[in-house]
Amino acid sequence: RKKIADFLFNREKTFHFTAEELNKIINKKDNLEKISLATIYNTIDAFKKAGHLKEILTNNNKSFYDTNVSSHHHFFDIETNELEDINYNDIKVVNLPHAPKGKKIQDVEVTLTVKKS
């Protein structure tokens, strides 16, 4: 876990990734001890539950993870499978429906799907 945490959280910019991408990067970076995909998923899940990662589900049902856990939106490029942050205040969401009975809206995050024009 420490090796994964160091890689994810000791960087200047936020990082968007899938579990499979992280597995390839981590295992290519250090040839000494390979980390299994199951360990990657378990570690991601632990970081998610602790509030250190955010999961973004794209329209192709692929889970990406984000080291930026503050409220913000995303562009998702369907051709490159890459996410790019959008400042939270750059999108105004109006006329939200009422939350189901007994529930309240906690947050609104928008993912805009893009492709080359």
Predicted regions and their residues:
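Positively charged, aromatic-enriched patches within helix-turn-helix-type DNA-binding elements
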Residues: 31-33, 65
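Short capping segments at the starts of secondary-structure elements
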Residues: 11-18
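DNA-recognition alpha helix
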Residues: 18-31
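Basic amphipathic alpha-helical segments that dock to polyanions
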Residues: 40-50
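Non-DNA-binding regulatory cores of transcription-related proteins
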Residues: 50-117
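Pre-recognition alpha-helix immediately N-terminal to the DNA-recognition helix
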Residues: 3-7
